[in-house]
Amino acid sequence: MTLSSEDREAWLARWREGRTHFHLDQVHPTLMRYIDQTPLGGRILVPLCGKSLDLGWLNDQGYEVVGVELSEQAVSELFEQLEVEPIRTRDGPFEIWQSPGLSVYVGDIFELTANSVGTFDTIWDRAALIALNPTDRARYAPHVSSFLKKDSTVLLSVLVLSLIHI
């Protein structure tokens, strides 16, 4: 099951219209704080990566980084920020943008399979879980977990909200 056409279009529209307030202009502090909990040089999956500076930073730290992002615009902006000219290939429904140690799959995270990308030592989920439509969250966790090696690590940044009833 893939993302609905409405969810796809809403996400792509956010990027087209510049409604990306969630994007940080720095490496995420939580990632920097906890990266030492992961195997150095391991493979890291970054779902719904956008144009996050985390990908370049992780690559610079010696990790093999694989991102997944629906918006080609976001991926293009990422590689522009990194000042890297990617090699672009196609694998099934995905266009893959690659540079040494970094690959970004442009397409629907729910169409990604371990057969195409392999398995990972770590998943860094900065905001993918909260970016998804609530109806997709229940299937997201088991889906991305299927990419994990045994004894792997998930770094998950979440928001804690207090609900006040009036």
Model regions and ranges:
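Conserved beta-strand signature within the Rossmann-like core of class I S-adenosyl-L-methionine
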Residues: D151-L159
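S-adenosyl-L-methionine
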Residues: M1-L40, L82-L112
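Conserved small/polar residues in nucleotide/adenosyl-binding loops
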Residues: H165-I166
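Conserved class I S-adenosyl-L-methionine
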Residues: G41-G50
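A short glycine-rich, Lys/Arg-flanked "PGG" loop and its adjoining helix->strand segment in the class I
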Residues: A138-K150
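A short acidic, Gly/Pro-enriched loop at the edge of an enzyme's catalytic core
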Residues: N115-I123
